[in-house]
Amino acid sequence: QPHPDEFVGLM
């Protein structure tokens, strides 16, 4: 389950 915080890193 990917955390939303990790997604921010991609952005």
Swiss-Prot record:
Q: Assign the protein's first listed, main location to one coarse class.
A: secreted
Q: Which GO terms describe its biological process?
A: defense response; neuropeptide signaling pathway; tachykinin receptor signaling pathway
**Which subcellular locations apply to this protein?**
Secreted
Give the sites modified to Methionine amide.
11
Q: Which InterPro entries does this one have?
A: Tachy_Neuro_lke_CS, Tachykinin_dom
Family matches, as PROSITE patterns: TACHYKININ (PS00267)
Which superkingdom heads the taxonomic lineage of this protein's source? Eukaryota
- A Pfam family matched in the record: Tachykinin
Signal peptide range equals none
Q: In which tissues is it expressed?
A: Expressed by the skin glands.
Family recorded in the similarity comment: Belongs to the tachykinin family.
Q: What is this protein called?
A: Kassinin-like peptide K-I
Q: Which organism is it from?
A: Pseudophryne guentheri (Guenther's toadlet)
Organism classification, top ranks? Eukaryota, Metazoa, Chordata, Craniata, Vertebrata
